[in-house]
């Protein structure tokens, strides 16, 4: 396969933005489910306890091993092919849940304009979202990056306008009450952490396209440094201003247009239209950017001989068109299935894969101390291990608290374990029919 380096810093910042966030969408359900005070506290805590350690570790790994396949390559270098396959498999399973959500999100905001869409029409819209994003991806990484910039600016401008319009109407503390009435504190904390974590995960996703990034050893860490504050500020500023100027108890999933009507006074109606359009744009851009990232996992595994060779082929643009098309076909099938109750399982599978990546940095630092890129965390091995332990503790807390909520927690944990448990037998099948790895994984 021959790839083409076309992503510079700014497009990569917005690809990361849509790999992780896409705007404050779903924050409204976090506030409604757990209460504004707890929601705001969680939105401050997760970036410090999860995202900051993750971005630092991902930045060093991406700088150290700037290869197509990203985290799959890091785990392969540290732990070998078995654990690399598990990492890729877990990623693929949670991507099926993840990618089924965005067409649903698109339909939610489309419902603001067309509230009576039937099931067949919604599924048709979902397919249009999937294959519209696929058409952009087939043109290569550069069009995905450029479209991400345009979509990101449109979404961020909408929420900036809402913030400015809501400020004159702020009439109460946005963090009151701390907990939603009638909620069990531990159950609310577990659910809130899971929802918030889902809104902050994915900083490693775009590492899979590093073979298509210009000067990736420097560009990926630099893009992370811009994207993290952009995402965090977007969540906090929007939630604070809207909660201070509206009744949080009436918030609901997909409810930003209604929040704009309640919080923005005379500007409520035009802002509601803007945010409904922004929700649709964000959903399409999320699918678009994540298809770019997720499709490179079968590409990397195929280049190692663990999947059919045709998935590693690239076209004249340097695009792995077969991997993109096969990924889109799977996501189209799973768009028929409702995964609304499996967001916690999605988070757990991602976290399991991420912990393997953290372990990769620790092992590579110890085993190959001379292996380094343009960026390195300015800490010794012990401090880096402690840094990686912080999000690991957050994960254990979430698992423990999730068990307090039998409606969501226990089924999600069982689903995550079942999905992960399929990895070893699938690896055995893959190695039984393994092909010779491709020798050339170069980029132009």
Where would I find each of the regions flagged by the language model?
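Membrane-interface "cap" regions at the ends of multi-pass membrane proteins
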Residues: 1-59, 65-69, 78, 176, ...
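Helix-loop-helix junctions that connect adjacent transmembrane segments
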Residues: 4-5, 40-41, 120-121, 150-273
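Transmembrane alpha-helical segments of multi-pass small-molecule transport proteins
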Residues: 9-17, 43-44, 113-141, 156-162, ...
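A generic transmembrane alpha-helix motif of multi-pass inner-membrane proteins
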Residues: 33, 345, 349-350, 381-444
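Hydrophobic transmembrane alpha-helices that form the core helical bundles
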Residues: 33, 52-130, 134-138, 143, ...
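TM-loop-TM module centered on a large, flexible mid-protein loop between adjacent transmembrane helices
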Residues: 73, 80, 111-116, 225-288, ...
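Membrane-interface loop-to-helix entry segments
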Residues: 121-172, 183-184, 224-228, 343-357, ...
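C-terminal membrane-solvent junction of multi-pass transporters and transport-like membrane proteins
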Residues: 147, 183, 310-319, 354-408
């Amino acid at each position: 396969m021959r790839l083409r380096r076309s992503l510079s810093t700014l497009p990569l910042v917005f690809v990361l933005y849509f790999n992780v966030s896409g705007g404050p969408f779903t924050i409204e359900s976090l506030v409604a489910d757990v209460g504004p005070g707890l929601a705001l506290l969680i939105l401050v805590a997760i970036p410090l306890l999860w995202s900051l350690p993750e971005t630092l570790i991902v930045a060093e790994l991406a700088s150290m091993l700037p290869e197509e396949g990203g985290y799959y390559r890091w785990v392969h270098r540290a732990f070998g092919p078995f654990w690399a396959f598990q990492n890729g498999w877990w990623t693929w399973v949670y991507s099926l849940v993840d990618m089924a959500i965005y067409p649903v999100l698109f339909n939610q905001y489309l419902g603001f304009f067309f509230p009576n869409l039937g099931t067949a029409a919604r599924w048709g819209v979902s397919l249009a979202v999937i294959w519209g994003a696929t058409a952009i991806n087939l043109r290569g990484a550069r069009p995905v990056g450029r479209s991400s910039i345009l979509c990101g600016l449109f979404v961020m401008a909408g929420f900036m306008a809402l913030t400015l319009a809501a400020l004159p109407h702020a009439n109460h503390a946005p963090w009151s009450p701390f907990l939603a009435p009638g909620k069990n504190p531990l159950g609310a904390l577990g659910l809130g952490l899971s929802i918030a974590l889902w809104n902050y995960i994915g900083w490693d996703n775009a590492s899979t396209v590093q073979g298509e990034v210009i000067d990736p050893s420097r560009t990926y860490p630099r893009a992370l440094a811009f994207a993290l504050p952009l995402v965090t500020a977007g969540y906090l500023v929007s939630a604070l201003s809207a909660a201070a100027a509206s009744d949080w108890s009436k918030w609901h999933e997909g409810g930003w247009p209604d929040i704009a009507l309640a919080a923005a006074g005379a500007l409520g109606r035009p802002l509601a239209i803007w945010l409904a359009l922004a929700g649709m744009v964000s959903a399409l851009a999320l699918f678009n950017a994540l298809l770019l990232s997720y499709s490179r996992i079968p590409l990397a595994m195929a280049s190692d001989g663990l999947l059919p060779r045709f998935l590693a082929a690239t076209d004249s643009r340097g695009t792995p068109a077969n991997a993109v098309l096969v990924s889109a076909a799977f996501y189209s099938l799973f768009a028929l299935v409702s995964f609304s109750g499996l967001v916690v399982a999605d988070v757990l599978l991602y976290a399991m894969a991420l912990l393997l990546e953290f372990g990769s940095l620790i092992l590579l630092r110890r085993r190959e101390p001379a292996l380094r890129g343009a960026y390195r965390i300015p800490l010794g091995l012990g401090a880096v291990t402690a840094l990686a332990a912080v999000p690991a503790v957050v994960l254990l807390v979430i698992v423990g608290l999730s068990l307090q909520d039998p409606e969501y927690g226990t089924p999600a944990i069982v689903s995550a374990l079942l999905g992960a448990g399929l990895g070893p037998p699938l690896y055995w099948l893959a190695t039984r029919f393994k092909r010779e790895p491709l020798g050339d994984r170069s980029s132009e």
